[in-house]
């Protein structure tokens, strides 16, 4: 719905502005952003991380279409990988290898979430599976939620879970450092 998209864009612009102001050290009237400002300052969270996270939200608001696996992985990085990076910093991690593993954990979680929620997401107009994958099994993007495609979707969900496994293994290497 166009109105929803416009209101989403307006809200995103507000969040970007509040994020920029928090990083600029401006006094924050919003209690959530005042707390956010304390966290980013205390834990030296790079500004690029929350801005990247908001870019992931923008992909949803704009109805981004995922043509390739790289597109899907970019979304996963933006909505979950950078969350792993920020959380690792809050937990005191600074070493690049540890931060990389935290990012991998976020990617693994998001790939798993996508696999779990394929039909539910499609019912609200969000398809995170690569269009290339859907074409391989003959599912038009606008038919992902239809019951006749469940068997083919199960194979794609399994493929996503398989794709997540190396990220989980990588992440487990960094857990001891958190």
Question: How should these model regions be labeled?
Answer:
Residues 1-175:
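Acidic catalytic motifs of isoprenoid enzymes
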Residues 178:
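Active-site/pore-lining binding-face segments in mid-to-C-terminal subdomains
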């Amino acid at each position: 719905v166009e109105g929803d998209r416009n209101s989403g864009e307006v809200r995103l612009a507000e969040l970007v502005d509040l994020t920029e102001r928090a990083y600029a050290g401006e006094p924050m009237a919003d209690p959530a952003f005042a707390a956010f400002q304390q966290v980013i300052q205390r834990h030296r969270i790079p500004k690029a991380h929350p801005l990247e996270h908001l870019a992931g939200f923008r992909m949803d608001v704009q109805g981004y279409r995922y043509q390739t696996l790289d597109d899907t992985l970019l979304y996963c990085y933006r909505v979950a990988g950078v969350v792993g990076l920020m959380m690792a910093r809050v937990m005191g991690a600074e070493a690049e290898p540890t931060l990389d593993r935290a990012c991998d954990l976020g990617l693994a979680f998001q790939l798993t979430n996508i696999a779990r929620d394929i039909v539910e997401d499609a019912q609200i107009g969000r398809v995170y599976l690569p269009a290339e994958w859907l074409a391989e099994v003959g599912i038009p993007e606008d038919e992902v939620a239809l019951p006749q495609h469940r068997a083919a979707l199960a194979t794609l969900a399994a493929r996503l879970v398989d794709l997540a496994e190396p990220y989980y293994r990588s992440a487990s290497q960094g857990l001891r450092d958190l």
